[in-house]
Amino acid sequence: MSAEAGATVEQNHSYDMSCIFCRIANKQESGAELLHSDDDLVCFKDIRPAVTHHYLVVPKKHVGTCKTLTKDHVQLIKTMMEVGKSTLQKNNVTDLEDIRLGFHYPPFCSISHLHLHVLAPASQLGFLSRMIYRVNSYWFITADELIDQLQAS
């Protein structure tokens, strides 16, 4: 690790060295191509894509799962959605009506670091993927529904 990278990680008090998404977001993990990176978020391809375009939008700071969020996180979710849609457009997805944006509830999320699934085209999800990313089910919630729930709490 370079001194510069080490300093960046050291300064980020919300970094969890054991979290793969923290390591990817802070460029401590080789092999993950960042499709988007800004001061707060990164976006990269899912390692097990369910459709042609399956990306994850992840905060650089370690944030727990969608179950740990409060009203204060609504803007974060909205920004994550914007990054997801922008990444789709940069990758030639033109039909933003045929997408799915959402989160898995614990214990159905494999990584306990908030990550937005960005899927397109949603109409091409296979049978198993339609179950895994089933809209507003016991295990998966759309970003819009999560925002509604957080604002109502």
UniProtKB/Swiss-Prot annotation:
Catalytic activity: adenosine 5'-phosphoramidate + H2O = AMP + NH4(+)
Protein name: Adenosine 5'-monophosphoramidase HINT3
Biological source species: Xenopus tropicalis (Western clawed frog)
EC nos: 3.9.1.-
Molecular function as annotated in GO: adenosine 5'-monophosphoramidase activity; nucleotide binding
Domain HIT: from-to ranges: 20-130
Active site feature: 115 (tele-amp-histidine intermediate)
Biological role stated in the UniProt entry: Exhibits adenosine 5'-monophosphoramidase activity, hydrolyzing purine nucleotide phosphoramidates with a single phosphate group such as adenosine 5'monophosphoramidate (AMP-NH2) to yield AMP and NH2. Hydrolyzes lysyl-AMP (AMP-N-epsilon-(N-alpha-acetyl lysine methyl ester)) generated by lysine tRNA ligase.
Recorded name of the encoding gene: hint3
Cellular location(s): Cytoplasm; Nucleus
Keyword Metal-binding in annotation: no
Sequence motif Histidine triad motif, residues: 113-117
Intrachain S-S bonds: none
Record text on subunit structure and interactions: Forms dimers to octamers and even larger oligomer.
Alphabetical keyword list: Cytoplasm, Hydrolase, Nucleotide-binding, Nucleus
Main localization category: cytoplasm
Gene Ontology CC entries for this record: cytoplasm; nucleus
Family annotation (Pfam families): DcpS_C
